[in-house]
Amino acid sequence: MXKKNFIPSVSLVRRDLPTLVTTTTSSTALSKPTSSVVSETSSKSLPSLTSSAFSTSSGXTSSSSLIVASITPPSTVGNPFILNAADKPNGTVYIAVGAVIGAIFISILIWWLVSXYLSRRFTMTNSYANDSKNLYRGHHKHSSSLQSNPFDINDEKSYMQDDWDSMSQLESSQYEDAASPFNPIQDPFTDNRRSLFISPTLQVSQYEKSHSRHQSKDTNIFIDDPSLYVGTYLEEEEEEERKLNLNRPQRAASPERKEKKINSMEGYHKRNQSSLGLIPVASATSNTSSPKKAHKRQAPSMFLDDVLNGREII
């Protein structure tokens, strides 16, 4: 229904201006004319305002209908280009992505475990092989059992426990012998030093005493096989040669420096960085045989060495 706005129509009635009427009267009684003006005013009432309103017009109703077609997806039956998701659960894409990520993490974890196991096994095999070669060189039965089954530690605990104490003592003695005897930090007698004089001969003699003490300790160690010693035949020869040289120490260098002809003593003094052994052994024996003559020709350092060793009295 359409409604219209009704505007009232106003009709204006036109009117004329009022007329002015003038009347003149004359009188003869006074012989004087008198005029009186009578004004007559005619007035009209105001026009009436009439309003007329049109009646409301009847609205016409019209009805229209719109036809909408329903959209239906194509059927998946027999269509290879459309995925049939009717029989699949919700969130299939998320499940597939999570499965792929989980498979990647599981493969990384398996690879790490396998690599750690293989590296540990390789390390244990090498360590047991080296131990069997170094510590059990003479024991063929023990080394064969270790090499055949390197992870069977329980069978070898009894053998290793018996020899472990002796091997630890042997290694400690080797480390003590390997220490430099001429290092003042390692020498315990330097703490009680009363003078600033340093005598190489005194240090050699003190090292000889300590070495003999360690050697007596080493002889008490029970070793059933000489092959347990770590070292070769050349190292044993050098050790014996060093013992012989320490048993007869040479005197300090005199002003007449002569080259030594013995190659073994030369190598020994080069290793220890000392100036001993530059004079032949015969001069040392001659000095010990005739102390009075040697006293006239020996250097002041040699005289102080003799005083410290008790061979000379001031």
From Swiss-Prot:
Residues 254-269 have a biased composition (Basic and acidic residues). The keyword Phosphoprotein applies. Residues 32-59, 240-309 are annotated as: Disordered. Its main location: membrane. The keyword DNA damage does not apply. Keywords: Membrane, Phosphoprotein, Transmembrane, Transmembrane helix, Vacuole. It comes from the Eukaryota. GO terms for cellular component: cellular bud neck; fungal-type vacuole; vacuolar membrane. The modification Phosphoserine is found at residues 148, 254, 274. It is found in: Vacuole membrane. The chain crosses the membrane at residues 93-113. It is a single-pass membrane protein. PANTHER family: CHITIN SYNTHASE 3 COMPLEX PROTEIN CSI2-RELATED. Belongs to the PRM5 family. This is Vacuolar membrane protein FOSTERSO_4058. It comes from Saccharomyces cerevisiae (strain FostersO) (Baker's yeast). The lineage of its organism: Eukaryota, Fungi, Dikarya, Ascomycota, Saccharomycotina.
